[in-house]
Swiss-Prot record:
NCBIfam families: fbt. This is Probable folate-biopterin transporter 3. Gene3D superfamilies: MFS general substrate transporter like domains. One of its GO terms (cellular component) is membrane. The chain crosses the membrane at residues 40-60, 87-107, 120-140, 145-165, 186-206, 212-232, 269-289, 302-322, 334-354, 358-378, 405-425, 439-459. Signal peptide: none annotated.
Length: 497
């Protein structure tokens, strides 16, 4: 009997020890290991760089994107009282500073201010965004043209800060090559968490302080960019003469033109431009419908914000799916199937507008949450292989500037799609109070998504492990080319269609 009791006690002790080790393992995975990782990055890269990444990617881009998207929709609808077709056009205008990102990149690389190439541009970006947001917050009955100017200026501030922190990240990647992947993960993590928090809080904040009050909060977050510029550790650099700066701009243009003469480069670029341009955006029409339509769900501000937060979660799931299961498949195959699913997901809006979901017993909120989650997940899966492909199209010596140019081409496509969606909404007479033809807008939008499927032959049928450019473009350096040190860290950051 004594032996049996000792054996039972020994088994209980072993079971308890196993459970304790399991709990310690979970605690180490969830808390201790991430904290050790963050501490390592701070010690290796300097705290000011770490602070800059959190502010730019997490606060300015992530949190700011979530707050500004919802507040701008309500600002156009409630303060400016414009039609959904107009709002769709103006949303496209706000993105123009992102189209000229290569210009900001060249400025930060070749035009130092007072001997510094990074810190002054953070300060400029912060003041530009802060002043524009404060004007929107404090000014009553602001004229539409001035309001648009402020929104564009705020967008420019975020874009300049984005380009500048990209340069800092790449500089650290050069000096600490073993930490390059860790830095990209840090950037993406900050942006994703910031976006999720921003969208989750946006509806509540718009309800409590109004859309203009949210702009006041965004002005405060923009002020943090000024702090980044003041505390960032940077060594002074030699100022360049005006002639030398002009020569570098001319050399950059010549090198870019030469690169675009390769079919391996211009064909994927043409696909990115056309596929984005024909995928019309009708977000503002849908927003007006599910907030103002008598036959619609009449969602509150809080509900709108929470719906968009599920879109951010869908983007994260899309990233995880691609990174873990799809990244080794050929680019063309992944994009083809993502485009096919995108066509089908477009008709989910039709089911909602025709109220078929209610006949099936599916509540509006549940159905829209699923729609938002699925559409953002598919959009992210479609976009990631194009991002990886773009990184392989950049010739040696000008990777940063050329990558920014490729991203600008995609932004041009999104601008065309936003304006095209506005024209379609206007042509079919979808207004603040009339939504009779919204179903037809959705059908046309969804059918146009078929066009890029017929253009996938422009994408090279290779995977992420393949080399696309000729060897001489990968090994040679541009003798008098652009002194760029900037490779985009946008795998988890870029906005979506």
């Amino acid at each position: 009997m004594a032996n049996r009791s000792e054996e039972a006690e020994y088994e209980n002790d072993s079971r308890r020890n196993h459970q304790d080790k399991k709990k310690e393992g979970v605690l180490d995975l969830v808390l201790k290991r991430p904290l050790r990782w963050l501490r390592m990055l701070i010690e290796e890269l300097h705290w000011s760089f770490f602070f800059g990444v959190i502010i730019v990617y997490g606060v300015s881009q992530g949190l700011g994107k979530g707050l500004s998207k919802v507040s701008t929709q309500y600002y156009f609808k409630d303060e400016q009282k414009i039609q959904p077709s107009q709002a769709q056009i103006y949303v496209g205008l706000i993105q123009i500073p992102w189209i000229i990102k290569p210009l900001w990149g060249l400025l930060t690389d070749v035009v130092p201010v007072l001997g510094y190439r990074r810190r002054p541009y953070f300060i400029l970006a912060g003041f530009l965004a802060m002043i524009s947001m404060m004007v929107l917050w404090l000014h009553t009955n602001l004229h539409l043209a001035l309001a648009l100017s402020c929104l564009v200026a705020g967008s420019a501030g975020v874009a300049i800060a984005d380009v500048t922190i990209d340069a800092c990240v790449t500089q650290c990647s050069i000096s600490h090559p073993t930490l390059a992947a860790d830095m990209q993960s840090l950037c993406g993590l900050c942006s994703s968490i910031g976006s999720l928090v921003g969208f989750s809080l946006s509806g509540v904040l718009v309800h409590l302080v109004g859309s203009k009050g949210v702009y006041g909060l965004l002005g405060v977050t923009a002020g943090l960019l000024v702090v980044v510029g003041m505390v960032l550790k940077e060594s002074p650099s030699r100022s360049l003469g005006r002639k030398h700066v002009n020569d570098k701009f001319l050399d950059a243009g010549s090198a870019i033109w030469k690169t675009f003469q390769y079919g391996e480069v211009w064909r994927p670029c043409l696909f990115m431009l056309l596929s984005a341009a024909v995928s019309l955006h009708i977000h503002e029409g849908m927003f007006y419908w599910y907030t103002d339509s008598k036959d619609g769900p009449s969602f509150s501000k809080e509900a709108v914000g929470s719906i968009m937060s599920f879109g951010a979660i869908g983007s994260l799931v899309g990233i995880l799916l691609y990174q873990n299961f799809l990244k080794n498949f050929p680019f063309r195959n992944v994009v083809f199937w993502a485009l096919s699913l995108s066509v089908l997901s477009g008709f989910l809006d039709l089911i909602l507008v025709l109220r078929i979901n209610l006949k099936l017993g599916l509540p509006d909120y549940f159905f829209i949450v699923v729609d938002e989650f699925v559409s953002h997940m598919i959009s992210r899966i479609k976009w990631l292989p194009l991002l990886v492909l773009s990184s392989k199209l950049c010739p040696a010596g000008m990777e940063g500037t050329f990558f920014a140019l490729l991203m600008s081409i995609e932004h041009i496509g999104h601008l065309v799609s936003s304006w095209g969606g506005g024209v379609l909404l206007h042509a079919l007479k979808v207004t603040r109070t009339q939504f009779d033809n919204l179903w037809l807008v959705i059908v046309i939008r969804s059918l146009l998504r078929v066009i890029p499927i017929g253009l996938v032959f422009l994408i090279p049928n290779v995977d992420s492990n393949s080399t696309i450019l000729p060897a001489e473009m990968l090994t040679s350096r541009i003798s008098e080319g652009v002194d760029t040190e900037k490779i985009e860290m946008t795998a988890l950051i870029s906005d979506e269609a």
